[in-house]
Amino acid sequence: LKPLFEFSGACAGCGETPYVKLVTQLFGDRMMLSNSAGCSTVWAAGAPSVSYTTDENGHGPAWGFSLFEDNAEYGFGMFLGVAQIRATLALKMRVLLEGGDISAALRSIMEEWLEGKDLGEGTRERAAALTAALDEALAEKDDAELKALREKSDFFVKRSHWAYDIGYGGLDHVLASGEDINVLVFDTEVYSNTGGQSSKATPTGAVAQFAANGKMSRKKDLGLMAMSYGNVYVAQIAMGASQEQTLKAISEAEAYPGPSLIIAYSPCLNHGIKGGLGNSQMQAKRAVEAGYWSLY
C-alpha cells in the first residue's frame, strides 16, 4: 500500500513518523487530520510544503492544525461539521428512495450506501459506485436533489491527531462525547519540539528540563483514565516491539463505532538514546521487554 505521507522534515529516526506513514497507508484516502502545534506540525507542514499527499485518484488526507490548547475542540468541530453534512445527505437519499423517480440500479446502490455509510471497510468502493450511478442519472435529467447528493458523497472518516498535556481538558471532553472519533497520541514523554521539558507524560525519576533532579510525580496514566468511561477503545502500542499488535490496534480503533485512543511509544532525540535515533525501533523493543512500556 502506498503511504500518503512523504518527505517529512522530521529528525532522522523520529519515533512519530512511522505511525503516521502506517495510518496513511491504511486510511489515507479518506482521512481528516486535526493536528496541534508541535513536532507533528513542524515535520508535516514546514512552509511552503505539506508532507501529506494524494493517490493516483487525487484522494488523500485533509489536514489542518490549531493551537495546542484547543486542538481537541478544533478536531471535534471538523467531525461534527462532516457528520451534519452526511446526515443531511442521508436524509436527501431517503427522500429520493421513498418518492423520487430513480432507476432500479440507482435505488439499489443508494440502499447499499445507506446501509454501510458508517463502515470504513469498502467505503471507497461504495462511493465510486454511487458517483458513477449519479453521473449517469444526471446525464439523463437535471435533478437538484441528485446534484446535492453527488457533490457531497466523498465525506467519510474523521480522525483527530493530538498531544498529551495542555489540551487534556478538551481531549477528555471529546472522548466523553461517545462520538466516533479516533485519537492517536505520540508519547515522547517530554515536550519534544521545545527542547525536552518535563510534562505529565514524563515518568517518575526521569531527568528532563524543569526536572533536573528527576521528576517527583508519577506519569499520568492516560489509557486508564480513558478506560474509566467504559465505552472508549484504548490501546497502547510500540511499533518496534510488535508490528502485528500495532497494526491490529490501529485497525480495530478505526473500525470501532465510538471514541478510540491509541497511545504510541515514540522514541525522541531528547531521550539521548545511545547510538542515536537510528536505534529508535530497537529502543521501543527494549522498553517493552524491560517492562517499561506495556502493550495492550
Which residues are covered by each model-predicted region?
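N-terminal leader/propeptide and maturation segments of large enzyme subunits in energy/redox metabolism
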Residues: 68-152
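Conserved thiamine diphosphate
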Residues: 2-10, 66-80, 84-101, 205-255
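Thiamine diphosphate
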Residues: 16-22, 29-32, 42-54, 145-197, ...
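Core alpha/beta catalytic barrel or barrel-like domain that forms the active/cofactor pocket
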Residues: 126-129, 134, 158, 185-199, ...
